């Protein structure tokens, strides 16, 4: 965040594959997508991220042709597919349920789409075998779905989707049914497979960590509109508003009031009652309310004892959570606000494992903060 962690925002030379222009969609008179514009580039892994009901799955279904738009246009490879039936789009979808045929073998499940397309019989076996080899299931070709684990079923669904060589693969929360460890493994496998195939993936999830792990680009949605579109690092370190900041990982929000502008970058402000310099890249006036945002890992804490005087926000440790590599502390400021602090665990530091009710000073590296206008006092 800020100056010390400046992002590399070099433009990427990617060509557009899908263009959504002015897309609107309503169900039962309720608008779920509103004037949405989105470009999806060739060969990228793009994630639509947002809470339940934000419209992300509807966008996926509109691209797939499983729903029709009320307004706007969808282009695929410079062709208008707005009103093209789903079966005639070079787009395949992997659903949350995988939708495998229980009475068919793995081989026949993967071959199903090829047979429906009337692919020559001589081509089917080698293409299915290649697809199963890609997802490391070649030896499971004659098994039925019920004989496979959840992760293996997921890979069958992906093999069935890619065997048709689609231009675009859509995945609708397709990892959510897996347990935590298997989901982490599949995240890595899915990203590696996407790089190997070179197919554009559009992935829908409400899991922020999943989006950060897998994506080249994340589109954060709320109430049918795009709140922010950027790389995982941009979304995490440079949130554009309080919703994005709060939705992507843990973040602390401090109330601030402008005292005066010092120069083009810095403002003197009172942050939770403490005067300090903050980096503000927009026009402000004395007395204006601001939000200062800091991730738990960007905060520094130091114990205050009788014999030392330390600058910072003063508070007291109320909770401690040991998480292996990190120690998370909840610190209550003197004004009652709760602050989350995350530190890498250091067993060699005798002062590291803070005791409950220990008096602490909280500070941060100047310019690591993200500053936003106070949305409540605009």
UniProtKB/Swiss-Prot annotation:
Give me the Gene Ontology terms describing cellular component. ATP-binding cassette (ABC) transporter complex
Q: Which CDD domains match?
A: ABC_PotA_N
Gene Ontology MF terms in the entry: ABC-type putrescine transporter activity; ATP binding; ATP hydrolysis activity
Lipid bilayer topology: Peripheral membrane protein
Keywords carried by this UniProt record: ATP-binding, Cell inner membrane, Cell membrane, Membrane, Nucleotide-binding, Translocase, Transport
Location in or out of the cell = Cell inner membrane
Q: Which EC numbers does the record give?
A: 7.6.2.11
Name all ABC transporter domain ranges: 18-248
Q: Which reaction does it catalyse?
A: ATP + H2O + polyamine-[polyamine-binding protein]Side 1 = ADP + phosphate + polyamineSide 2 + [polyamine-binding protein]Side 1
Major localization class: membrane
Is Zinc-finger included in the keywords of this UniProt record? no
Q: Which residues bind ATP?
A: 50-57
- Protein family membership: Belongs to the ABC transporter superfamily. Spermidine/putrescine importer (TC 3.A.1.11.1) family.
- How is the subunit organization of this protein annotated in UniProt? The complex is composed of two ATP-binding proteins (PotA), two transmembrane proteins (PotB and PotC) and a solute-binding protein (PotD).
Q: What does this protein do?
A: Part of the ABC transporter complex PotABCD involved in spermidine/putrescine import. Responsible for energy coupling to the transport system.
The name of this protein is Spermidine/putrescine import ATP-binding protein PotA
Origin species = Salmonella typhimurium (strain LT2 / SGSC1412 / ATCC 700720)
